[in-house]
């Protein structure tokens, strides 16, 4: 384990003493260090009647147990302090470590022995081996009462609200959209779990079209075969109009009653970060949105009608929209428990909705935590004039996602009444998708949140993985740079795939978000501020560094690609084409081994480089015909240890999100030997070689100069490493699988790779 502590706030000594005293640690500034440590530990072991026993089973050094040490005349030393501290954090002395000084250096332990009271205060705010901070572990065990009131420690809310005796209710928010054109505003179901509190509380809201269930069977039927010919497009300039949103006004009167009438029973799934905040005094709201089970309307996936309906839930929390008790719309209930302040959470589609909501500038949305979210839907299902699939899901497109998320069809009555209209709407969507050309058009323009990024007022926290080929890093990169300069923005850029990171051992992500939301949603005045970029170092396990920016580098390193012309044959023998189409993983393996139709260029790294931004290929290239698909991947090549893209379980169900509440696994990205690691990749239709909105002819056997930016990333390379650039045509995981007989030729002498560093 390595300690990477971003959540700790330096407080004045009087605040430290006061907070310690409230938790029963009655330490005196004038006492000597040894006495203070004993006082601290006897309170620490509050679950024991006889505190001599837990002291006797800890060690001060290799020869002395802690009780014996306190009974001796020996002085407290830095070595003894560290030895005790690590044992309190769950490390076994003489098993996990023997030399505390060596161990603290190896683990990056954040505490430097000096002022013992401040040391002990920071120790309580440090994460244990099992994933909780020490103070959270003690509170979970009953250090302070579960009195349904707020208690703060180091600028963070503690788990002092009951997660058993909570209010569970359902309301139906009246949206300002009518997606199915029935002349009535769509209703959106809101599932609420909130702690009991005599006052107003903030809300954690997760906008998830998956929450009420998904129609996997219908979605699978809507998948496309990826085999087909790359379209030869007519040259033209793509024209667009400003997206429009038509809103509807509230209709009719509804009796105001005091409480919701529908009780929330079981929910399909919760998000463990939300679970963590519930006993800390934050309501949990789960909203599936229009076109989902128990709501009304069509599934409009990603457009501002869908976003508006989610926004209207925040409006209801602030008294600007109505919520009914049921679908009759006869009785309404106010969110009189809400303080109006909201944070959004969730990954993938959930993070996408956070991005979209932020761009409305809605009042009350204080923070978004957008994890692996889409910023422009075109870049999810298309790339540079190509029809593409999200990584791992060949054949998926917007209409199959619509079938997946239109969960109203899971209710037989809704299916009978509404499926015909839903299918008619889906046919319109299919026509607008334009799978034929892969070009950007008005349909995608209406689902581009970057156009409204200037409206964002909330503080923004992103998480994204360098190995996320589902929602590719371009999404967070573009959103990060499109935000107004005056707002606070932060990015946790890890080396995983399309994954959550709130339960990783190496970083105090949950505690950092707690500090932020306690400040922004509960009004606690602290100096807490996250760095702009927190990056997971790819060269070592469990190592995180603060950076000033994502991209924007002034310096670059250029690699020449060679001296000769090389060709990429597009067509494969039928046997290989069928084999790759059946299992794209086989294609990826053979591509990395140099066995596919490809140009492979090994580039030795002659000095340390820190890539930060978008690698760019400048290629002189020609096609043997009037079309061309170019794929590129940049690898770090060579057998060595690399961080793996998916977290592994270190310890099962050891993280406590409250008081024995929603226990979850402690995880981390493994660091183990592999033959290579993908650094970045990209795909380009050569007819869109100069601009996404400009389609140009390709003249057979005529040279073209192409500038091709790959996916943005942050990646460290060391002298002696090897980069491998792979250029090819069809990518059997991502692109259309065109097996026509043509080839691309690259003049390597007139081509180069540029890395921002």
UniProtKB/Swiss-Prot annotation:
Enzyme kind, highest EC tier: hydrolase
Keyword Hydrolase included in the entry's annotation: yes
Matches recorded under Pfam families: Peptidase_S15, PepX_C, PepX_N
Listed GO CC annotations: cytoplasm
Alphabetical list of InterPro entries matching this protein: AB_hydrolase_fold, Galactose-bd-like_sf, Pept_S15_Xpro, PepX_N_dom, PepX_N_dom_sf, Xaa-Pro-like_dom, Xaa-Pro_dipept_C, Xaa-Pro_dipeptidyl-ppase/CocE
One MF annotation (Gene Ontology) recorded for this entry: aminopeptidase activity
GO biological process assignments: proteolysis
Subunit structure as annotated in this protein's UniProt entry: Homodimer.
Entry function: Removes N-terminal dipeptides sequentially from polypeptides having unsubstituted N-termini provided that the penultimate residue is proline.
Protein name in UniProt: Xaa-Pro dipeptidyl-peptidase
Organism: Streptococcus pneumoniae (strain P1031)
Gene, per the UniProt record: pepX
């Amino acid at each position: 384990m390595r300690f990477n502590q971003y959540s700790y706030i330096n407080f004045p000594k009087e605040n430290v003493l006061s907070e310690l005293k409230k938790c029963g640690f009655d330490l005196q500034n004038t006492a000597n260090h040894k006495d203070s440590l004993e006082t601290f530990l006897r309170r620490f072991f509050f679950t024991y009647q006889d505190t001599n026993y837990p002291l006797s089973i800890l060690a001060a050094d290799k020869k002395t147990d802690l009780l014996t040490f306190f009974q001796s005349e020996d002085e407290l030393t830095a070595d003894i302090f560290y030895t005790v501290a690590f044992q309190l954090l769950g490390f076994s002395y003489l098993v996990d470590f023997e030399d505390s000084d060596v161990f603290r250096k190896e683990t990056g332990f954040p505490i430097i022995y000096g002022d013992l009271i401040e040391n002990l205060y920071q120790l309580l705010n440090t994460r244990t081996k099992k994933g909780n901070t020490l103070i959270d572990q003690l509170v979970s065990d009953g250090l302070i009462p579960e009195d349904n009131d707020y208690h703060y420690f180091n600028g963070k809310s503690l788990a002092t609200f009951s997660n058993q005796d909570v209010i569970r209710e359902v309301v139906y928010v009246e949206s300002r959209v009518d997606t199915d054109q029935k002349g009535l505003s769509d209703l959106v179901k809101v599932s609420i779990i909130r702690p009991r509190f005599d006052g107003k509380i903030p809300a954690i809201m997760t906008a998830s079209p998956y929450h009420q269930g998904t129609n996997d069977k219908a979605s699978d039927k809507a998948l496309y075969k990826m085999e087909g010919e790359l379209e030869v497009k007519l040259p033209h300039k793509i024209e667009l109009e400003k997206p429009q949103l038509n809103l509807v006004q509230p209709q009719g009167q509804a009796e105001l009653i005091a409480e919701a009438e529908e009780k929330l029973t079981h929910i399909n799934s919760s998000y463990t970060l939300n679970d963590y905040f519930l006993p800390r005094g934050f309501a949990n709201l789960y909203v599936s949105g229009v076109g989902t089970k128990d709501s009304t309307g069509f599934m409009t996936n990603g457009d501002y009608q869908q976003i508006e309906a989610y926004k209207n839930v925040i409006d209801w929390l602030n008294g600007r929209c109505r919520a009914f008790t049921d679908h009759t719309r006869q009785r309404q209930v106010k969110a009189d428990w809400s303080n109006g302040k909201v944070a959004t959470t969730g990954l993938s589609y959930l993070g996408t909705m956070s991005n979209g909501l932020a761009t409305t500038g809605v009042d009350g949305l204080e923070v978004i935590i957008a994890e692996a979210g889409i910023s422009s839907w075109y870049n999810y299902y298309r790339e540079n004039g190509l029809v593409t699939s999200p990584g791992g899901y060949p054949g998926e497109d917007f209409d199959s996602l619509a079938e997946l998320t239109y969960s109203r069809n899971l209710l037989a009555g809704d299916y009978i009444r509404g499926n015909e209209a839903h299918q008619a709407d889906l046919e319109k969507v299919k026509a607008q998708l334009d799978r034929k050309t892969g070009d950007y058009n008005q349909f995608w323009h209406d689902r581009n949140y970057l156009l409204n990024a200037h409206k964002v007022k909330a503080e923004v926290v992103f998480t994204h993985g360098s190995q996320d080929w589902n929602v590719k890093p371009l999404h967070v990169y573009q959103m990060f740079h499109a935000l107004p300069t005056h707002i606070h923005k932060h990015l946790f850029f890890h080396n995983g795939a399309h994954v959550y990171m709130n339960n990783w051992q190496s970083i105090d992500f949950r505690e950092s978000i707690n500090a932020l939301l306690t400040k922004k949603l509960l009004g606690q005045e602290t100096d807490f501020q996250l760095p702009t970029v927190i990056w997971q170092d790819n060269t070592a396990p469990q190592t995180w560094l603060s950076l000033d920016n994502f991209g924007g580098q002034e310096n670059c390193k250029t690699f020449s690609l060679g001296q000769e012309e090389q060709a990429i044959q597009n067509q494969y023998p039928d046997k290989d084409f069928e084999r790759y189409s059946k299992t794209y993983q086989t294609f990826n393996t053979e591509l990395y081994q140099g066995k596919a139709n490809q140009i492979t260029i090994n580039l030795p790294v002659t000095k340390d480089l820190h890539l930060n931004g978008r690698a760019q290929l400048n290629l002189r290239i020609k096609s043997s015909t009037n079309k061309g698909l170019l794929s590129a991947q940049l690898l770090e090549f060579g057998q060595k240890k690399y961080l793996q893209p998916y977290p592994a379980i270190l310890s099962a169900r050891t993280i406590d999100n409250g008081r024995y509440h929603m226990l979850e696994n402690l995880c981390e990205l493994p660091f183990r030997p592999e033959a290579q690691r993908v650094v970045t990749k990209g795909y380009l239709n050569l007819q869109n070689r100069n601009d996404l909105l400009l389609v140009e002819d390709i003249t057979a056997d005529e040279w073209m100069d192409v500038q091709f930016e790959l996916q943005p990333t942050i990646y460290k390379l060391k002298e002696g490493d090897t980069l491998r650039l792979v250029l090819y045509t069809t990518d059997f995981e991502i692109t259309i699988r065109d097996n026509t007989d043509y080839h691309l030729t690259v003049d390597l002498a007139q081509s180069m790779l540029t890395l921002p560093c």
